[in-house]
Design a protein with these regions (language model features):
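Membrane-interface amphipathic segments in extracytoplasmic regions
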Residues: 1-186
């Protein structure tokens, strides 16, 4: 779902952050120019680019829930951003997150870093509607939310992580939290 936009930009789709919703919203509004490269590519030649980040707790919970719901799919190729962690399987969300952190403790900050290095604007999953409207104002798009105001696309319901798992995420990958807080906002 990585694509160029009308107005000389590019959307860089970080998995499990709300990118499918962004794609469908912009497509419905005629802002998608053309897909490019890999579905989740982070390199581009456009004037500017944007991506969406998700709070690290939410990102890990969403990824683990999606993997469980898909039957632990290993659908990624070697170039996919999740290739390093997609093989993890565990019957609980907490167990899967802990297994990922034990093998790849800084995975999320490394993945976020690749996309942040190429992005001028950063939206947050938790404030996505407001952020996409702010971006629209900055880059001169005319976006109508229509049915998109309520709900998401491709959203996997997930539970809360345990306090123990949250502490483990904070200890293993503090840079992911720094990136989430300090990335340039819209």
């Amino acid at each position: 779902m990585t694509f160029t936009t009308c107005g000389g930009g590019a959307f860089l789709h970080i998995p499990k952050t709300g990118g499918t919703w962004v794609y469908y919203l912009l497509r419905e509004n005629g802002m998608v120019a053309s897909p490019f490269g890999h579905e989740h590519g982070h390199l581009h030649n456009e004037e500017w680019a944007f991506c969406v980040l998700r709070h690290p707790f939410g990102w890990y919970a969403s990824h683990a829930a999606f993997q469980r719901a898909s039957g632990f799919s290993t659908w990624t190729g070697a170039e996919h951003p999740l290739a390093e962690i997609v093989h993890h399987q565990h019957p609980t969300i907490d167990g899967m997150v802990r297994a990922i952190l034990e093998e790849s403790p800084t995975f999320l900050s490394r993945m976020y870093g690749k996309f942040l290095d190429s992005s001028k604007y950063v939206l947050r999953n938790e404030t996505l509607v407001d952020d996409i409207m702010s971006l629209s104002d900055k880059v001169g798009w005319s976006i109508r939310l229509r049915s998109f105001r309520e709900g998401r696309r491709n959203e996997t319901p997930h539970g809360e992580l345990s306090d123990e798992t949250k502490r483990m995420i904070e200890e293993c990958d503090p840079d992911a939290f720094v990136q989430y807080v300090n990335a340039p906002n819209v």
